[in-house]
């Protein structure tokens, strides 16, 4: 009987650590996160509101720099990228379009405008940085592009950065 008890004690002493410290095999997490990067969102908003500010209709060079930045991000995300001239006085303004997934079938369109407003206050022209109207929307659009690069959708997705939502254009609905 003592031998049986001793055998159980030895077995228990060896099995207990194995039971306590046993870790099941798990797959490694993907090397790239599948969520939006707060740092990248902030970087894009800062670029649009500080580096290429103002982005209003009377600052076509900054609008073009913004469009190039957006286009570069779309291209690096593996999208089929096109630009569309928007026929508005004072332009040409450009919509930047990125297509993901199948070219045929249903299409989900998500957009944000990259121009910002200007106005006259006390007979002086003022420019808004446009962080919440709509640099933050463009930042979200570009992060979505990065995420779509990681997992190609089964339904067509079109991301559109509009150039002329603010006056004098007010024509973000002009997707040609």
Model-derived regions, located:
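Solvent-exposed loop/turn segments at secondary-structure junctions
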Residues: 87-89, 102-104, 114-118, 164-168
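Solvent-exposed, acidic/flexible segments
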Residues: 34-41, 56-67, 91, 107, ...
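Acidic/histidine-rich catalytic neighborhood of metal-dependent amide-processing enzymes
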Residues: 128-176
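A non-catalytic alpha/beta surface segment that caps or lines the substrate-entry region
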Residues: 47-103
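Glycine/charged-rich beta-loop-alpha catalytic/anionic-binding loops adjacent to active sites
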Residues: 106, 117-127
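Hydrophobic membrane-insertion alpha-helices, especially the h-region
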Residues: 4-21
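N-terminal capping segment at the start of a domain
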Residues: 18-65, 77
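Soluble periplasmic/extracytoplasmic beta-strand elements of cell-envelope proteins
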Residues: 47, 95-99, 107-113, 156-162
